[in-house]
């Protein structure tokens, strides 16, 4: 009887650990790096943020899809409470969406982007989901934001208005949803750590052994 209970405990612990690892592997939330000591001057302007405390934050990973020419798309949000932070549209075309001179002047020639063929849309500035972006971005992308080439959906989907000439003039447009700052993640999506599982499992085993003895 004792052997069967111990074997059952082992199976339960093994199952919990594997479930936790699977959740972490499939999670859309990726770790971000803070680098306050070694600030980059030639960083990627799209994947670079400055958080509320003044730390430099580099986004490691984003959700990325390709939009075919002349077709609309819907992006489902991986975030339960906060639908979207921002997106940028990147074109494979040699014609830049952002003029080179405009981009470089606003960034004082520090953050040059080869081709400057990117456009960012900051979403929902008046909501809790809005994350302040790097200090130069609002100037660069202000006009595009005001044109409202997107709308919010009740189903947590971002609907791109593909009839807009800026989107349809390119053969392929890449739409990427920028991940939020880790501290702003929805706590309901976070998984239990392996250390916590190990401690709980150990306490459970001690409790079972006391019942047996």
From Swiss-Prot:
Coarse class of the protein's main subcellular location: membrane
Annotated GO CC locations: membrane
Residues the record marks as carrying a glycan: 92, 114
Name of this chain's protein: Putative transmembrane protein DDB_G0267860
Disulfide partners: none
Glycoprotein found in the keyword field: yes
Signal peptide as annotated in the record: 1-22
Keywords annotated in UniProt: Glycoprotein, Membrane, Signal, Transmembrane, Transmembrane helix
Membrane topology per record: Single-pass type I membrane protein
Membrane topology (Cytoplasmic): 213
Ranges that cross the membrane: 192-212
Domain of life from the UniProt record: Eukaryota
Subcellular localization(s) per the UniProt record: Membrane
Extracellular side: 23-191
């Amino acid at each position: 009887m004792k052997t069967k209970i111990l074997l059952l405990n082992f199976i339960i612990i093994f199952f919990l650990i594997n479930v936790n690892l699977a959740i972490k592997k499939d999670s859309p939330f990726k770790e971000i790096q803070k680098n306050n000591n070694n600030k980059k001057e030639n960083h990627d302007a799209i994947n670079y943020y400055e958080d509320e405390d003044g730390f430099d934050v580099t986004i490691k990973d984003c959700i990325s899809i390709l939009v075919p020419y002349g077709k609309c798309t819907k992006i489902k949000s991986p975030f339960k409470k906060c639908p979207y932070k921002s997106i940028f549209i990147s074109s494979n075309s040699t014609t830049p969406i952002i003029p080179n001179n405009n981009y470089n002047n606003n960034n004082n020639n520090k953050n040059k982007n080869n081709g400057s063929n990117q456009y960012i849309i900051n979403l929902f500035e008046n909501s809790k989901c809005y994350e302040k972006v790097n200090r130069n971005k609002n100037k660069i992308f202000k006009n595009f934001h005001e044109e409202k080439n997107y709308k919010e959906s009740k189903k947590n989907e971002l609907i791109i208005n593909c009839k807009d000439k800026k989107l349809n003039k390119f053969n392929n447009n890449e739409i990427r949803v920028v991940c939020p700052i880790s501290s702003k993640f929805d706590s309901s999506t976070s998984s239990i750590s392996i250390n916590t599982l190990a401690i709980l499992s150990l306490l459970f085993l001690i409790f079972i052994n006391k019942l047996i003895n």
